[in-house]
A protein has these predicted regions:
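Short, solvent-exposed loop/beta-turn-alpha elements that line the ligand-binding surface or hinge
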Residues: 114-127, 194, 211-235, 289-293, ...
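Conserved N-terminal structural module of periplasmic/extracytoplasmic solute-binding proteins
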Residues: 2-102, 106-107, 118-122, 333, ...
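Extracytoplasmic/periplasmic substrate-recognition and gating elements
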Residues: 59-60, 246-248, 289-357
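Extracytoplasmic/periplasmic solute-binding protein
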Residues: 140-146, 152, 176-229
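Short helix-initiation/N-cap motifs at beta->coil->alpha
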Residues: 70-79, 172-177, 253-265
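Glycine-centered hinge/linker elements that transmit conformational signals in sensory
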Residues: 179, 222-254
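Hinge/lid segment of periplasmic solute-binding proteins
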Residues: 98-152
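C-terminal capping/gating helix-and-loop segments adjacent to ligand/active sites or protein-protein/ligand interfaces
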Residues: 318, 358-368, 379-434
C-alpha cells in the first residue's frame, strides 16, 4: 500500500515490538539482556527496513543488542516529548530533526555528537552533506542522519501536456502562462490537497527560496525579529496569491485532503496537469494510477527558477533525511551501544538496498549503481541528482519550526490560500511566534 506524507511523518500510540510479533515482527532482545532501547515508526515497508537493521545488529551483538519498540500515528510526538522531559526516553530516539531537535538539544536532553562525527569523519563524509543541517543546533551535531531523502518534486501529466500542445515550465513566468492554457481546455493547472495545509506550504518553501534564497527562511530559524516581513518574503506570498487568483489550482482545493490521495488521483486521471508534491508521491502514482507510471505518463522535475530571483535553482525543499539521537539520560553502556549501532548498523549495504528496493533514495552517497539497477531507476536517479546537487536543502517548514510556530504557520497558510488574509497580515501573524 502506498503511504502518504502523514503516514510517513505521523507517529502515535506505542506498540511494543514483542507484543506485535505476529503482526509486524520484533527485533530486539529483552532489556534484561543489557542492551539499549530504540523507538521508531511502524508501518510497512519502512518498519521492515528499520527492523532488519536492528535484527542484523543484534545477531552480531547477542549480549548487548537493541530492544526496539514501534509506534504509529501522531500521538507519538506527545509521548516522546513526555518521555524525554521525564528522563525516561529510549536510548535511541527516532525523529525528523529541525525544531523539535533544537528544543531537546538546548535543554540538554540529547547527546552532542559533534566530537563523535569528528572521530568518525568517514561516516560523515559518506552521507549527503545537506542531511546534517536539520541535525545541527548552534553549530553542533545532535543527530545521525539516516534512512532516505525526500525532496519535493514538480510532477506533470505528459499526456495532458501533449494534448494541450505545451511544454513543461522552465520558469515561474512559464507556470503563470500555462494556467490559462489548461483552464481553457477544462483541465486544472495544478492539483492541490489544500485541506491538509502542509501541501500548500511546499509552494511557499520553494517561492521563498527561489526569490530570496535560503537566507530568508534561515532568518526565521535564527529568530530574527520581523523576519517574515522581508521584502522577498512578501513578494513570494504575493506570487502564490496571484496563482490562486488566476485559478491555478483545482476548484475546491481547500476541501481536498492529501491523506486520501485524492490530489494524486487528479493528476493521473488527467483532471489536473501538474502537482507539487514529495518524492513519496511517485509510489502512490505507481500503485494507484494503473499503467500511468509504467506507461511513461508521469513527468517530474525540480521546481523552476523565478525570473530575477536570488535563489540557486539547484536548491530544493522537503525532508533531507530522518534522524537518530541519543538520550542524554542513557547510561554510559547504552550510549556506547547506540554509537556502535550508528557506526556499524545504520545504512549498511543490506539496508541501503532495501530502501532502494522500496522506491526510496538513501541518504548515503555512492549508491548510483544500485539506483541505476532499480525498478524505478529514472525517478530515483532524478531524485538523487536533486538531493546530491542541491546547494541548499530546506527542511519542511513544519518540521524545521517549533510545534507552536508550525501550527500558527499552517493555520495562516490556509487563510493565505483562501485569500482571506493579505501577505502582510500573514507575515504579522508569523512574526508574532518567532522564537516561540
Amino acid at each position: 500500500m502506498a503511504l502518504s506524507r502523514r503516514s510517513l511523518l505521523g507517529l502515535a500510540a506505542a506498540v511494543p515490538a514483542s507484543a506485535a510479533l505476529a503482526a509486524c515482527g520484533s527485533s530486539g532482545p529483552g532489556k534484561s539482556g543489557g542492551g539499549a532501547t530504540y523507538w521508531y515508526l511502524n508501518g510497512q515497508p519502512q518498519e521492515g527496513v528499520r527492523a532488519g537493521a536492528v535484527d542484523a545488529y543484534n545477531k552480531a551483538h547477542p549480549d548487548d543488542g537493541i530492544e526496539d519498540t514501534t509506534f504509529q500515528n501522531d500521538a507519538y510526538k506527545t509521548k516522546i516529548k513526555t518521555a524525554i522531559g521525564a528522563g525516561q526516553a529510549p536510548t535511541i530516539i527516532w525523529g525528523w530533526g529541525g525544531g523539535t531537535l533544537r528544543t531537546y538539544a538546548r535543554a540538554g536532553q540529547v547527546e552532542d555528537l559533534t566530537s563523535w562525527f569528528d572521530e568518525h569523519s568517514d561516516i560523515k563524509k559518506s552521507l549527503l552533506a545537506t542531511s546534517f543541517d536539520p541535525a545541527t543546533v548552534d553549530g553542533k551535531i545532535y543527530a545521525m542522519p539516516c534512512e532516505n531523502v525526500q525532496p519535493v518534486v514538480l510532477y506533470y501529466n505528459k499526456k495532458v501536456f501533449d494534448q494541450v500542445g505545451v511544454e513543461p515550465p522552465e520558469s515561474w513566468d512559464d507556470i503563470m502562462a500555462l494556467v490559462p492554457e489548461f483552464n481553457a481546455k477544462g483541465i486544472a493547472p495544478f492539483s492541490l490537497g489544500g485541506q491538509s495545509r502542509w501541501t500548500n506550504m511546499m509552494w511557499l518553501e520553494f517561492l521563498f527560496d527561489r526569490i530570496g534564497g535560503p537566507e530568508v527562511f534561515q532568518a526565521v530559524i535564527e529568530g530574527e525579529k520581523n523576519a517574515w516581513s522581508n521584502p522577498d518574503a512578501i513578494t513570494a506570498l504575493t506570487k502564490v496569491q496571484e496563482l490562486v487568483e488566476a485559478d491555478g489550482f483545482i476548484k475546491g482545493f481547500s476541501s481536498i485532503t492529501a491523506d486520501s490521495n485524492a490530489d494524486q488521483a487528479l493528476l493521473y486521471t488527467g483532471k489536473a496537469a501538474m502537482m507539487l508534491h514529495g518524492s513519496w508521491s511517485y509510489g502512490i502514482q505507481q500503485a494507484d494510477g494503473g499503467d500511468f507510471v509504467a506507461g511513461g505518463g508521469l513527468g517530474y522535475m525540480n521546481f523552476p527558477p523565478v525570473d530575477g530571483g536570488k535563489g540557486d535553482p539547484s536548491n530544493t525543499v522537503g525532508n533531507p533525511a530522518q534522524y537518530l539521537s541519543i538520550s542524554s539520560k542513557a547510561t554510559a553502556e547504552e550510549k556506547k551501544i547506540a554509537k556502535d549501532f550508528f557506526a556499524t548498523g545504520v545504512l549498511q549495504d543490506a539496508e541501503v538496498k532495501a530502501w532502494i528496493d522500496n522506491g526510496s533514495v538513501p541518504v548515503r552517497l555512492g549508491t548510483e549503481k544500485l539506483l541505476a539497477a532499480s525498478k524505478s531507476a529514472d525517478f530515483l536517479e532524478v531524485n538523487y541528482g536533486i538531493a546530491s546537487k542541491a546547494g541548499t536543502f530546506v527542511q519542511s517548514w513544519d518540521q524545521a519550526l517549533s510545534p507552536t510556530a508550525a501550527e500558527t504557520l499552517l493555520d495562516n497558510i490556509v487563510k493565505l490560500f483562501q485569500l482571506s488574509i493579505s501577505p502582510k497580515q500573514f507575515a504579522g501573524a508569523l512574526n508574532a511566534v518567532i522564537g516561540k
